[in-house]
Amino acid sequence: MESALSARDRVGVQDFLLLENHNSEAAFIENLRRRYREGLIYTYIGSVLVSVNPYKELEIYSKQNMERHRGVNFYEISPHIFALADNSYRALRTERRDQCILISGESGAGKTEASKKILQYYTHICPTRNNTHTIRERLLQSNPVLEAFGNAKTLRNDNSSRFGKYMDIQFDYKGAPIGGHILNYLLEKSRVAHQNHGERNFHIFYQLLEGGEDLLLKRLGLDKTNPQHYHYLIKGNCPRVSSISDKNGWKVVRNALTIIGFEDEEIQALMEIVASVLHLGNTQFGEDEEGETHITTEAQLQFLSQLLGVDGSVLKAALTHKKIVAKGEEMISPLSLEQALSARDSFAKAIYGRAFTWLVQKLNRSLAFKDEIYYSSKCSSVIGLLDIYGFEVFQHNSFEQFCINYCNEKLQQLFIELTLKSEQEEYEAEGWERVEYFNNKIICDLVEEKHKGIIAILDEECLRRGDASDITFLEKLEDTLGGHAHFITHKMANGKIRKAIGREEFRLVHYAGEVNYNVNGFLDKNNDLLYRHLKEVLCQSTNHIVSQCFHADELMDQRRPETAATQFKLSLAKLMDILMSKEPSYVRCIKPNDGKQPGRFDEVLVRHQVKYLGLMENLRVRRAGFAYRRSYEAFLERYKSLCPDTWPNWHGNLPEGVATLVKHLNYKPEEFKLGRSKIFIRFPRTLFITEDALEAQKQTIAVTLQKSWRGYRERANYHRIRHAVIVIQSWWRGVKGRRKAKHRRQAADTIRNFIKGFILRNEPRCPDNEYFLDHVRFSFLMKVKRNLPKSVLDKSWPKPPPSLTEASEHIHRICIRNLVNDYCRRIQPEWRKQLEQKVVASGIFKGQKDGYSRSVPKLFVATRLEAEEINLKVLQTLGSDNKVKYGIAVTKYDRHGFRPRVRQLLLTTSSAVLVQEAKIKQRIDYGALLGISVSSLSDGFFVLHIPTADSKQKGDLVLQCDHVIEAVTKLAIMADKIHNVNISQDSIRFAIARGKEGVIDFTSGSDLRVVKSKNGHLSVTTPRIS
């Protein structure tokens, strides 16, 4: 409640009951204007919420705002739709009585958005249970689906609901949403085939064309082009709207269908129906020379038959002929061009209308509470949301506007019954005077009365045989209703009014104002007939949805179906029964301007809506007796602090407490009255003075409460700290004493175990010496850890105790192995290769040949011949695949005369090659090499043994070089003959051609000498080297 006077002057009052001049419509509208200018779009009339469409996003619908309104009293915070929703929810929880929220207002006033905000609030604040998350999501996602198929852009609203919707949300005994149910009313099917200029067809057509996947559109026979290419989408000349994203809308609808539980096949069938309507619109007719009607667009007919799952020839015949059944006989007659076009449009409207009904039924199956029969559980309650068309007055008003405005009359009657009438009854119950108000029952009777009402006359004219027409219907209305105060026609009007009424129009004086209705099309729209031949075609459809919408039973039923107006009247009657069984809350929506512009307030337009919504009547009835009324308990609870006798608590009965309070506040007798259970305050200024006094008193109370609270808090804090200190002290002293005693016991046990273990240290391990032995082991291991060798050459090692000698040896070996492994991991690749060769040399020559120990420190080189020392022709002969890996200068001795010859020995990847300058003298493949022989002395001789069977070879090869250990090692590695190296002690035998053998004798001497001895052997004398 606005308490500060400056705030009230700036933003107005948040409850119209508090207006000083409550009879002034100008004051009412000015209060709306002030609040709208400050971004305050909600205002109360008692328990009725008035909402003004801001035409922009406001930061008042966040989750934080939802939490602010959860469980808060209706009048404790500023007006908000969340407050009204929470009030209904709490009444449902506490009183276990079904609730309903009625949202009304003209098209574009924000009814659909209001219902969505209420639904979002419930899905956020309600408790959860195992399966409620799915229900919440489906409840929310049902809105975009219904909007896509049931909403359209009109001149006044870019997202106008073209059908009425009533949704029940079912809650369990804990208040969690467990199900839902939707009722739909009077879908504007005529929009499928015709739209006024500046309006569009239903959203789904544009969303499919703009956002549908290429593959889907191809299957449906649609082009992702301008909607102007489709006859049913060009009537309004408004294919695209800047405020609507059809592409994003398709994504939202497609996702919502999946969440709700539609199968892919169902979505495909549904889109096929949507596409079939577009193809129907593009189906054109012509007349031949004989005047017979035929279809001129065969391609459209082919797509139609595929999408609807019917035979093409049968469909073609049904669109150009009609079947009449008379006295059991069937007759088929051709349709004129005009009749064929009308039948096509009726066909499209019937398909779309029944598909929409199927869609709502599918949503209901998805939202149904599976564990219990709907409405049957005693442990569940419902909140109903009514979002239905607002009062409509266009330049051209037809049958649809007549039904919509009739619906609004019924809702106004319900509002009168549940609100204004109940208000009057409250006054009478409290003993106040009766207040008069307008009751629109006379208008409802004018429309719906049996035999005399407009609907009854319309039905009678539709059933009359002969030349019944819209004009004869108008004449019948004039004859029957000519004297009614709320009915006027051109013929009945006086000269001044007659100019405003057409000859084919009649005027109804609604509660909201006067509306002229053009009778053209009333009979056809009321009949809403579909030729039997077309019904038969659809009954044979293989489309999953069409087959469910059109049953063969319809063809067997000979009764005339109820007219559209009668169906609507009956469904409205059922809706009224549902709403009357629930406790209502009201949201009255107002459109501030026709341009959908934020911040613009059109006073003339707002005044018209305030009038036809009956807001001033509602306010006058509430204020006729008293502006403010509250129960004794609520009034005393709020204002008891203003009187010392009632503060802080009143222990007597409530009426006496309120009387004591108002006496202290100096209320005058004419300013208030005490009823049986409530206090009534007549003037808003009395309440404002009381509110201002409460604001001032709050400051005093706040200071007192702060002072008392601080004193209490400090005393409590002191006692808490003192008690904590004492507890900590006593606890800590006990801990210290126990810890000290435990430490002494452990020390004594340790000393005792140590002494006993030392005495038995040389005995086998037992409980008496295990502590000492563990200590010795630990000490030794720590000593080893501190004195580990840093390199392989470090031979130091701590001396172990006798019991750990074996373990010490194992650890020492492991340590050395780790050092070696670590050393090996750090070796560079070239050094690794060097060591590998040295290891091979060691395995061959160590302890076998003189001079080996001197060769160990000397590194093996990669080659003893540089690249330029090898003749280029030799390299070319060897080729690129046979690269030289090692080369060394050698002396080759002839096999017969042992004449020395200078040669080069080249080791390649596959063979050993002996070269004389530019000529290859001999090539020995490694695979053919039988072995290698060297002497045990320090000479440089070695013999390569070759198979004697090889005709290309002349025998074994006797060679001598300065680095025999290096050369033989490399040759053995490359030829893989490591185990085929023979070290001879005295002589080496080698093969000569034709099975002969040669011998080399080795003797030790002071100098190196090589001669041929008398016995034909090669004698080699070499000094001994250690």
Curated annotation (Swiss-Prot):
Keywords: Acetylation, Actin-binding, ATP-binding, Cell membrane, Cell projection, Cytoplasm, Cytoplasmic vesicle, Membrane, Methylation, Motor protein, Myosin, Nucleotide-binding, Repeat. The keyword Magnesium does not apply. Residues 12-695 form the Myosin motor domain. Its main location: cytoplasm. GO terms for molecular function: actin filament binding; ATP binding; microfilament motor activity. GO terms for cellular component: actin cytoskeleton; cell cortex; cytoplasm; cytoplasmic vesicle; microvillus; myosin complex; plasma membrane; ruffle membrane. Residues 849-1024 form the TH1 domain. The keyword Hydrolase does not apply. SMART domains: IQ (SM00015), MYSc (SM00242). It comes from the Eukaryota. Residues 698-727, 721-750 form the IQ domain. Pfam families: IQ, Myosin_head, Myosin_TH1. ATP binds at residues 53, 61, 104-113, 157-161. The modification N6-methyllysine is found at K349. Residues 572-594 are annotated as: Actin-binding. It is found in: Cytoplasm; Cytoplasm, Cell cortex; Cell projection, Ruffle membrane; Cytoplasmic vesicle. The modification N-acetylmethionine is found at M1. One of its GO terms (biological process) is actin filament-based movement. Interacts (via its IQ motifs) with calm. Myosins are actin-based motor molecules with ATPase activity. Unconventional myosins serve in intracellular movements. Their highly divergent tails are presumed to bind to membranous compartments, which would be moved relative to actin filaments. Belongs to the TRAFAC class myosin-kinesin ATPase superfamily. Myosin family. This is Unconventional myosin-Ic. It comes from Danio rerio (Zebrafish).
